[in-house]
Amino acid sequence: MIMTVSDPGGSSMSSSSAITPESEQAMAAVNDAPVGGQLLQQRLALVEDLWQTVLRSECPAEQAERLLRMKQLSDPVLPEGNAVSSDALVSLIRDMDLSEAIAAARAFSLYFQLVNILEQRIEEDGYLESIVRSQDTAEQINPFTPPLATQTEPATFRELFERLRRLNVPPAQLETLLQELDIRLVFTAHPTEIVRHTVRHKQRRVASLLQQLEAQTESSTFEAGTIRLQLEEEIRLWWRTDELHQFKPSVLDEVDYALHYFQQVLFDAMPQLRRRLSSALASSYPDVQLPPSSFCTFGSWVGSDRDGNPSVTTDITWRTACYQRQLMLERYVSAVQGLRDQLSISMQWSQVSAPLLESLEMDRLRFPEVYEERATRYRLEPYRLKLSFVLERLRLTQIRNQQLAEAGWRAPADGLLSSNPEAPQSESLHYGSVAEFRSDLELIRTSLVSTDLTCEPLDTLLTQVHIFGFSLAGLDIRQESTRHSDALDEVSRYLNPDQAYGDLNEQERVQWLLQELQTRRPLIPPSVSWSPTTEETVDVFRTLHRLQDEFGSRICRTYVISMSHSVSDLLEVLLLSKEAGLVEPSAGHADLLVVPLFETVEDLQRAPEVMEELFQTPLYRNLLPRVGSQGQPLQELMLGYSDSNKDSGFLSSNWEIHKAQIALQDLAARNGVALRLFHGRGGSVGRGGGPAYQAILAQPSGTLQGRIKITEQGEVLASKYSLPELALYNLETVSTAVVQNSLVTNQLDATPSWNDLMARLARCSRRHYRALVHDNPDLVAFFEQVTPIEEISKLQISSRPARRKTGTRDLSSLRAIPWVFGWTQSRFLLPSWFGVGTALHEELVNDPDQMSLLRTLHQRWPFFRMLISKVEMTLSKVDLDLARHYVTSLGSADHRQAFDGIYTTIAEEYSLTHRLVLEITGQERLLDADPALQLSVDLRNRTIVPLGFLQVALLRRLRDQNRQPPMSESPSDGDGRTYSRSELLRGALLTINGIAAGMRNTG
């Protein structure tokens, strides 16, 4: 037997891990919810039945029964309704060998992923019900309900516009905002996206079959039975599929994964979003003009984010752009073929506009082969003939795009297409820009409208072209600030060793950079051989120039500077851009938007000072793009949630970001600059995650003004965009929240006493957090030993290393994502709440009457309510008894006393935070205000416990072997087998997969 699950310290599972009857109350509350209730219980029962059926068919009988018994013992509410001690569960796990442990890890992982599919279906139902409800009850909407403080359901466009109408928001004010509405969602490759693309495909198949099964009526017994068999078959195939990545994904693998959501969901979802907005606007504000189709667009870091990822090269970024264009061209070809089939209009029965006929004559001269092939067939069908020419141009554009992908960014553009013997000699025959393609489609639409005809598929395609263009999503380049200063230092040392850039102070650097920006001569000699890092840094800007020449400026116009500290960080990028021809300071022209990313608390505090100096610098200000009807200069600025949280803790990080937004918006307004804030939010609360709707509504009043940019990280892509209705749910809630925040003003952020209170809480929380995380010399060892952080690094889930190359293994080298991942696996979830309890407690010790103010803040201030809501949700997922098991089982003997002290500190802080959150919210249990979420967390918390025991046992055995000589492996605990390190590692990694699925987020 390999399992040793008894606590070496003598503790056993109790208190928070005990099965409690309160879950029955949660289930009863869910029964009364609009969506859920009996349907929820039926769906849970179906998932349970499918899971049990598959286990019984795929596992040996005795093993299957033990796995089912494990699940039964971990259920919050057993069929007989009795609370059960965890002793029986411990005993059951202790008797397992490695093969059974692996089967258990896989079984529970499968269970959680099935439950995740179920919850996605429930979210879809909730969204669809909200649409129906908003149509039926618009007249009952109370505009004076304080939506910014208390609304928990995402608003639909219909609900939003009706509320605005009743609040007497003038149509002109709404129209002005809608015309300048600018929502950008940026997909990133998340290192903790743990599920294989193959498994995601099976999940979508299961979700589709579940939806089909629910659609069956009582009379369709045969069809329902057939679908049920298909479900069992699909899940059995899933069971026999390896959950673990067998190799580290390449960057292009990650690109393919991200593009899937555009291909399968978003390409078709975006026109639906616009139609819903149009319908809702017509109902409440019929005279208000629709926003441009591109009011909501997408960006991507996948294939372009090179911060700490040496695998992202200039060639990779170039190929990524080609891949994205190829995907769009394929979708456009399919759409145009559909239009050609549909638009069978004959000139015998309908007139055609003169411009369309003239364009056909031009096309005949340019494409004689196409005309000869199609003219007879479509002699009297001008739309079909025109679309045949459009298809030919798309085909030639595809050929050119493929050649570009193969040739690379350094290849000359001239002659690429003509080198293909199948292509015409004239390069201009392909679409040189998306504007040419759009012009052809508009020509067809105008002709149809002139004869009183409409074509919804054509309108849909035009919307898609406006949103996606040929590039699909703009690629943001991201690079760490020191890469630019190091490159300029190397260049300057070559040119003048006595005045090296790296030896200058900040003021001297700014002076030198401004001087170089204003001179017309090049700085970087073209024939010098630089170091590989400098060559790559400089080549990025050359690649950008070539990308924009070939694909248009839309493909890659944003350059994000991570770890921005100073004015020189931005001017360095402008100078390197000037060298590549992207910036012409003398002409006040720039084809690149330079975006500082302020990440640490100190940098967030310094950000207004940095931007003030830049806004007061004429050269910099003149290079900003102009937006809006007033032609204001636009500055995009990114706020980092991850590193500021890791640096200072949850409460301090959120408060500093909140303050920075207000200060930066005030600064921008004083300088006549439009500000677009870019929120670098992760999937977990510890990295800025949580419900987007509440998060946007909680932004300081006046900081959005219709503009926002948000990262959508790989871990959450599946939960938001895997299904069409889920995608629409997310897109509509984000859009309505931005409009609502921008128009419904909230002056509570400016309440002095509230701000003073938050400042005190943030300072105290930061002090307590840093005392544990940064000042305790044993914390690094604690984290490395009592969490599976080392094993997490063995997961083949990302092209980016888990640590920065700093030469050390301290916390500064560890990225924020695995930092959160490790704490989540061991059920501490420390980054998302630690320090909050002490801050609240000290405030109340100094003045007990402050509890009344804290409750007022929770009821009325969206920002504070969001903070407490996130802390509450995180606390509900913490399991300190299980976490204690990690400490006592995995901590080394020589650290026992120190680790016990750290655990005690964490446990005391948890108890304090838990108690005070309940006092502030006025609840008896965490999440009482959200019974559906409470039930979901209860179900998951208890069912994850067996995986925690399994993980600890496997980690303990694996680490024991790692401490032995390579050829010396002890037999397992009495079962006569010797397990290799790779076998034990595989088992441990499977438990990581399972717990990640159960927690629904990782890092």
Swiss-Prot record:
GO BP annotation list: carbon fixation; oxaloacetate metabolic process; tricarboxylic acid cycle
Keywords: Carbon dioxide fixation, Lyase, Magnesium
Catalyzed chemical reaction(s): oxaloacetate + phosphate = phosphoenolpyruvate + hydrogencarbonate
GO CC, one annotated term: cytosol
Gene3D superfamilies for this protein: Phosphoenolpyruvate/pyruvate domain
Cofactor(s) for this UniProt protein: Mg(2+)
UniProt-annotated stretches for the region Disordered: 1-24
PROSITE patterns: PEPCASE_1, PEPCASE_2
GO MF assignments: magnesium ion binding; phosphoenolpyruvate carboxylase activity
Disulfide linkage: none
A Pfam family annotated for this UniProt entry: PEPcase
List of catalytic residues: H190, K646
Stated family: Belongs to the PEPCase type 1 family.
Role according to the record: Forms oxaloacetate, a four-carbon dicarboxylic acid source for the tricarboxylic acid cycle.
The protein's name: Phosphoenolpyruvate carboxylase
